[in-house]
Amino acid sequence: MSQKIQGGSVVEMQGDEMTRIIWELIKEKLIFPYVELDLHSYDLGIENRDATNDQVTKDAAEAIKKYNVGVKCATITPDEKRVEEFKLKQMWKSPNGTIRNILGGTVFREAIICKNIPRLVSGWVKPIIIGRHAYGDQYRATDFVVPGPGKVEISYTPSDGSPKTVYLVHNFTESGGVAMGMYNQDKSIEDFAHSSFQMALSKNWPLYLSTKNTILKKYDGRFKDIFQEIYDKQYKSEFEAQNIWYEHRLIDDMVAQAMKSEGGFIWACKNYDGDVQSDSVAQGYGSLGMMTSVLVCPDGKTVEAEAAHGTVTRHYRMYQKGQETLTNPIASIFAWTRGLAHRAKLDNNKELSFFAKALEEVCIETIEAGFMTKDLAACIKGLPNVQRSDYLNTFEFMDKLGENLQLKLAQAKL
């Protein structure tokens, strides 16, 4: 390659522990030798978040809003142990949650598939992308124990002063029990719909929304109606032009259909369903180390990509002791490629688009040629049968990817 590809503006967020080490390796070996970026870097490591009172996370989110593309390394969300370990001022919130609250949008998780890595659901030859509506429902509910006999009612008091409406939830006669009130907002459901339709168009795959509207006629019916209305008004012609479709399905039908399908579709889930199904689907494909996570905003223009796993603390402890580490970097690499591919799409940058695709192909081809980290070798042979010759450590694997990328780009005469 005679000169570097001009890549445009990208916001990158550094993270914590083993993934932070890998993040620097990815830039050094796979990105910077080939791509010149206008890079806006934010250190989201736990110490810097603490030093800035988490302002750095908010600044990073605002930068993504401005430049439309963010790539994020995995970060620590502190619990009591972490507060003590790092002597933090307070238990800072999840950076992912903070960024999502500022940007809006929907998180889509997608498996990275290699032919030689066995899947628990062997029929899934294409990814199933799960979009979780990460707002409201059970996660913002008010629930309580009903101590004894009595009525539980829900009331709505209009802010314009008109009369309030009272709904009887249940009349507890013999004993108490439990009760819950939960909600969602039209605006949030509309944003969820737009993000889902945009994702389907960008992947050129059909979209399914799952609800239980036969039981929750008003609540889930609202999701169904809003999706249908937005689809008919704004997306139907585009979907038909790309020969893809949108359908609403009952959640139980959808789970069964997903299990017997070959994959290759977007599945829009309500909050709880998405929480459950995203982990179920991830396990079905074999490994969280091979799972990308992309936040797509309703405008379809703003995207933030990251790995779907954590900071790999156990491996970092080994790294700190100078021991060999065996961390799988693939999902972190794909955070970069998905971010760069989106930058290329926004700027109509064919060279950058080719590079992002080439790097993803190199990752998959290298694994399919038998070069991989221990977690993937264990998927193939079973952990007790894995020998040292079956896998590469983190740094050996990164070197191999770097070598193969150089070869691929040289062959393409980029």
UniProtKB/Swiss-Prot annotation:
Catalyzes the NADP(+)-dependent oxidative decarboxylation of isocitrate (D-threo-isocitrate) to 2-ketoglutarate (2-oxoglutarate), which is required by other enzymes such as the phytanoyl-CoA dioxygenase. Plays a critical role in the generation of NADPH, an important cofactor in many biosynthesis pathways. May act as a corneal epithelial crystallin and may be involved in maintaining corneal epithelial transparency. Substrate binds at T77, S94, P95, N96, G97, T98, I99, R100, R109, R132, K212. Transmembrane segments: none annotated. The record marks Y139, K212 as: Critical for catalysis. The modification N-acetylserine is found at S2. GO terms for cellular component: cytoplasm; cytosol; mitochondrion; peroxisome. Its cofactor is Mg(2+); Mn(2+). It comes from Bos taurus (Bovine). Keywords: Acetylation, Cytoplasm, Glyoxylate bypass, Magnesium, Manganese, Metal-binding, NADP, Oxidoreductase, Phosphoprotein, Tricarboxylic acid cycle. This is Isocitrate dehydrogenase [NADP] cytoplasmic. Acetylation at Lys-374 dramatically reduces catalytic activity. The modification N6-acetyllysine is found at K81, K224, K233, K321. Mn(2+) binds at D252, D275, D279. The modification Phosphoserine is found at S389. PANTHER family: ISOCITRATE DEHYDROGENASE [NADP], MITOCHONDRIAL, NADP-SPECIFIC ISOCITRATE DEHYDROGENASE. It catalyses: D-threo-isocitrate + NADP(+) = 2-oxoglutarate + CO2 + NADPH. GO terms for biological process: 2-oxoglutarate metabolic process; glyoxylate cycle; isocitrate metabolic process; NADP metabolic process; response to oxidative stress; tricarboxylic acid cycle.
